[in-house]
Amino acid sequence: MLRQSYLPIFDLINLNLYLTLKQNKMKKIMKHKFQYMLLLLLAIPCHSFAGEKSHVADSENLLLNKSLQQSVTIKGNVTDAAGEPLIGVSVLVKGTTNGTITDFDGNFSLSAQKGDILEISYIGYATQSVTITNNQPLKIVLKEDTKVLDEVVVTALGIKREQKALSYNVQQVKNDAFNTVKEANFMSALVGKVAGVTINSSSTGAGGAARVIMRGSKSITKDNNALYVIDGIPMFNANAGGASDSRYSTQAGSDGVADLNPDDIESINMLTGPSAAALYGNAAANGVVLINTKKGNVERTSLTVTNNTTFSDVYMMPEMQNRYGNMEGAFESWGGTTTKRYDPKKFFNTGSNVINTISFSTGTKKNQTYASASTTHSTGIIPNNSYSRYNFSIRNTANFLNDKLTLDLSANYIIQNDKNMTSQGEYFNPIPALYLFPRNDNFDEIQLYERYSVGRDLMVQYWPYDAQGMSLQNPYWIANRMNRTTKKNRYMISGGLTYKIADWVNVVGRVKVDNSDYRMQQKRYASTLGTFAGANGFYSDMTRTDRNIYADVMVNIDKRIKDFSINANIGASIKDLVYEQMGGEGDLAGIPNFFTVRNLNYSSNFKPKQFGYHDQSQSIFANLEVGWKSQVYLTLTGRNDWESMLAYTDTPSFFYPSVGLSVVLSEMFKLPEFMSYAVSYTHLRAHET
C-alpha cells in the first residue's frame, strides 16, 4: 500500500516512472540525515515573521468559552496497524493553526484545551479525530487508506479524473499552504512548495505581480507565465503596469490573479505538463494553475474571522567598497580612504502586510451559500510604496429536479489601489542613485530631499550632484515626488448549469464576465530632471478597460463496461476580449505642481493616447480516456481554435492533439521479492503533445 508521497525517480522527455519507498526500511538511514538537516535549518536567520488569529463561530459547537479554559500539554504516540511508529504525522487542533508533527519514534506533544479535537493525518492513511478529555497520553493507531490511489483530482476544464489514470503530473496545494503566512499576492506564498514550478515575486513592492514558470522557460522573448483557471473557467490575467524590464520603465503593476482573496480559495492544482493543458490550447502552453474556490457548508453554519499580519525587512544588501572615497565636490570614489561611511540600508523601511477577512458559510443538502469580505493593506520596504485591496464575494450552489439539475452562481467585486510600485528600470527607480551615492559623503543630508527656492517660490529638489550621465536624482525625491498610482475596480460574475441526463452522462454549460476599469496617473513635481518633466512638472492621466467574456458547453460521459472504463468529454467554447485605453500626458503649463488635464502644456510635449483591440476565439475540444481493470489507461485529446486575428490568413485555425498512457505496474505484476522490501507502488506515465 501507499506509505508516502510519490518520489520521482526519473523524467526523460515525456516518460515518468514513480516509485514509492516503504518508510520503515528507510527509517534508520533517514534519521541521521534528518537530524543534520534540522541543525542546519536552526542555524538559518529569520528575516520576517507573521502572526495569525482566527476565530470561528460554529452553529454546532461554539468555542467562545475556550479562552477561559486552562491549556494542558497533550502527549501521544502514533503507529500503524503493525505497531511501527510513524514519522512526520500531522497533529492539528481542529479549527486552529496550532499543531505539530511526530518525531522518529512517533511521539508528539502540544498545548491544547479540554474539549479540543485533534486531527491526525498522514499520507496513505485515513485521517483520525480524537477529542481531548484529559491530559493522559494518547495511543493512536492509523489505518491505511486504500482510497489514496483512487483519489479524484480536478484537471483541465474542471473535469474530475482518478489521479492514477493521468498520463501527466498534477500537484495539489491545499489552502493552508498559502494561508499560514499570507501575502498580498497569494501566489508569492507558494514559493518553493510545488516541485518543478518556479515562482518569482517581482521587486515592484507591496502587491506586485508573481511570475509562475513550470518546468523552465519555454521562450526567450515571449511570456512564460502559466494560465490561471478559476473553477474551470480561464481568467484574464492582465498586468496594469508597463514593461518592468526596461531602463525606461515607469509604472509597474500587479496582475489579475493578485486580486483574489486567498481565504476564498479551497485548493490549487498545478498542471505542469503540456499534455495536461492540451484542452486549453496555446494559452496553456506554459502550464495551468487551477484555482478551486470555496462553496457553502452542508447542514452546517459557520462564521469565520481571521487576521494575518506580516512584517518584512531588507534581506540582503550589496557589499560596498570602503577603501576609496570621493574627492571634495566629486561623485566618483577614486580618492583617499573613506573617513565616514553611509549605510544604504537606512533608506529602506520595514514593510507590513495586514489581511482581515470575515466569511460566512451555510447550507442544506439542496442549497449552499458562501460569502466573504476582506481587506488587505500593505506598505513596502521602499518609502511611499503602498497597496490596498477590498474583496467582496458570494457563491451559491443549488440543486433542483431531484438533484438532476445543479445551478452554481458566483460574483466577486474588487477595489484595488496601489502607489509607487517600483519598476526595474533605471530612471524611475531610486535604487541606482542610492547604491552609487559617494561613499565619503553625508547621506543624511539628502534625506531633506526638497528645499524652498526663493526665486521660484516653491519647494525644489535637493541633489548636490548632476545627473552623472545616468539621469540620477535624489532617491528620496524619486520615491516621494515622482508618484505613480493605479486605481482599479473589477467585477467577475459567473454561472454554471449542470444537467444529469443519466447516471453516466451529463451536460454542463458555463459563462463568465470579467471586467476591470483602471485609472493610472503619474505626477512628477517641478524641478524633476528635465528629461522627465518640464519646468513646472509633468502629468499623465490614463483610463483603461479590460472586458473578457467566456462561455462553454460540454457533454461528459463516465461509463464502465465489465473490465473497461470510458471517460469522454466533448464541447465547444468562445472567448471574447476587448481592451481599450485612452488619455493624455505632458508637461504642466502655467501653474507648477497643479496636476490637472487643463493645466497641461498643449503646445509642447503633449501626447494624447488612444489604443485598444478586440479579439475573439472559438474552439471545439474532445477528450477520451479508456481504462482497463483500473491498471492501464489510454487518453486521447484534441482541440481546434479559430482566432479572429487569423481570420484572413492561410492558417485560420490551429489543432492541438495529445496522447497519453498511464500504467500502474504494481497492480499488474507482483514485484520481485527483493524489490518488495523497499518498493510498494510503481507507476509508468508517457505522453506526447
Regions found by a protein language model. Give the residues of each.
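Short, small/polar-rich motifs associated with maturation and membrane association
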Residues: 2-414, 492-493, 614
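Surface-exposed loop/interface segments of Gram-negative outer-membrane beta-barrel transport/assembly proteins
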Residues: 148, 224-225, 230, 236, ...
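Transmembrane beta-barrel architecture of outer-membrane proteins
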Residues: 185, 209, 286, 353-357, ...
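Active-site-adjacent bridging/hinge elements
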Residues: 265, 367-372, 466-472, 594-600, ...
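Residues on the lipid-exposed face of transmembrane beta-strands in outer-membrane beta-barrel proteins
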Residues: 293, 358-362, 394-398, 493-499, ...
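Positively charged, low-complexity/disordered segments
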Residues: 688-689
